[in-house]
Amino acid sequence: MKTIHFDMNKYETHVDLEYLKEHGRVEKISDGVIFCSGLENAALHQAVLIDERHRGVILELNEEFVGIGLIDKTNDILEGMHVGVSGKFIEVDLFEEMAGRVIDTTGKMLYEESEEKPTATSPLFCVTPAIMTIDSVTRPLNTGLAVIDSITPIGRGQRQLILGNRQSGKTQIAVDTIINQHDQNVHCIYVAIGLKAAYIAEVIETLRNHGAMEYSTVVATAASDSLTAQYLTPYAGMAVAEALRDQGKDVLIILDDLTKHADAYRAITLLFNRPPGREAYPGDSFYIHSSLLERAVQMNEEHGGGSITAIPMIETLSDDVTAYIPTNVISITDGQLFLKSDLFNRGQKPAVDVGVSVSRIGGDAQHPIIRKLSKNLTLILSQFEELKELLDFGNALDDGSMKMVSDGRLLTELFKQKILSPLSVTELIVILYAFQNGFLTKIPPANIQTFKDLLLEKAHMHKDFESFSAQIETINELNESHIEMLEEIIREAGRLFS
């Protein structure tokens, strides 16, 4: 057998292995993601630059290629272009004053130009706070919505899901909650994920018109933005929230909505040829939401005492809460508010289905007076829903059952609330006290809204109500003077109404 001798010197091309560790080449482009060779030292979620001008982030690592998602939507990227690792993980820029800003995934100002330089950065992806650094949820975050603050209260540091069909009032609850924080020393962050640009502008305008942008930040990507930008948006919002929390502040973050976030992630993973699972979502869909929402906590005093309260939203189809993403997020959060289209269409706004909605830890943070006045409200509404079905079939009911129906109908009307008109804690106390002590039984349900407006008007005219409101945080129980004041308000409203 003849031996073959190779002359290695004839191969003049020299491969610089060190260069390939930090640099790569675009091999394939596909709908906002690129497949890249090289980048041997690449790490997940590292920021990269394509052709030294297009921003991207590493989202996929395997033996064959490095998968990069493009943050900016562009058609200028070509095969063969240079890809360089920045050496940093993806971050959002922070500024001296975050209130009033509308930013994108990386902290860049939207809708207006700014010469201001960022003062710091915050990583989009980080480890959840250690269990020894967090504290119990003991302080309320009032939404200003009677049905929520009384039956499914939310505490600072809690994760409370809002889910419901399209056009069932989810965003309106979030906007009302933000507006209600005007004097609560809470910094609000509204995160818009893949929504229509006109819709985002409408929400911003509403917040601005009610003075809420003075203590709010908006992190937004529109439906026309890249899939990667939509996927990164909630993490950018949470990164801003963590920076504020580390300053000892209380933060409320609204995630509108995680269904679109999951859809964007599903599209990205399918483009990277990852095997699909249930409903074509990838196997780590639960992880992307749990790793995000578990960053919303109440820190203990040794670690600043700040908090992040997260209110994610999920869009359901035909009120189906058993679908993959809704069940995932329900199991991650501390409770949920389920909005029913049927209730919304009947004029019950907010359209909260009390039978399915729950707040597992918010009761510990509820104001003691509200907690006492709300103790049997869920039972009243549940009994009303059961007995109402019997009435629909023309069944005769005894006097006790008819009283339950009457109370339920009264409470249902009492919980109806106009948009952008949140109630303070003391206003809610007036309303609940009037209901629980039988002052509303003679008022027809159709007139409840008119009487409620009159009741609140008389409350603000009472000489002692302002001082009562100022001291409410330190009052744990109604004394004789408080009860006398409440009954004077109710009697005066009743006298004028009759």
Curated annotation (Swiss-Prot):
Localization of this protein: Cell membrane
CDD domains: ATP-synt_F1_alpha_C (cd18113), F1-ATPase_alpha_CD (cd01132)
Keywords assigned: ATP synthesis, ATP-binding, Cell membrane, CF(1), Hydrogen ion transport, Ion transport, Membrane, Nucleotide-binding, Translocase, Transport
Matches recorded under InterPro entries: ATP_synth_asu-like_sf (IPR023366), ATP_synth_asu_C (IPR000793), ATP_synth_asu_C_sf (IPR038376), ATP_synth_F1_a_nt-bd_dom (IPR033732), ATP_synth_F1_asu (IPR005294), ATPase_a/bsu_AS (IPR020003), ATPase_F1/V1/A1_a/bsu_N_sf (IPR036121), ATPase_F1/V1/A1_a/bsu_nucl-bd (IPR000194)
Site label Required for activity, positions: S357
Top-level taxon: Bacteria
Enzyme Commission no: 7.1.2.2
Reactions accelerated catalytically: ATP + H2O + 4 H(+)(in) = ADP + phosphate + 5 H(+)(out)
GO MF annotations, alphabetized: ADP binding; ATP binding; proton-transporting ATP synthase activity, rotational mechanism
Cellular component aspect of the GO annotation: plasma membrane; proton-transporting ATP synthase complex
Enzyme class, UniProt record, top EC level: translocase
The keyword Translocase is annotated on this UniProt entry: yes
Entry keyword annotation includes Nucleotide-binding: yes
Membrane topology per record: Peripheral membrane protein
NCBIfam families named in the record: atpA, PRK13343.1
Role, per record: Produces ATP from ADP in the presence of a proton gradient across the membrane. The alpha chain is a regulatory subunit.
Quaternary structure, from the entry: F-type ATPases have 2 components, CF(1) - the catalytic core - and CF(0) - the membrane proton channel. CF(1) has five subunits: alpha(3), beta(3), gamma(1), delta(1), epsilon(1). CF(0) has three main subunits: a(1), b(2) and c(9-12). The alpha and beta chains form an alternating ring which encloses part of the gamma chain. CF(1) is attached to CF(0) by a central stalk formed by the gamma and epsilon chains, while a peripheral stalk is formed by the delta and b chains.
Family membership noted in the UniProt record: Belongs to the ATPase alpha/beta chains family.
Protein name per its UniProtKB record: ATP synthase subunit alpha 1
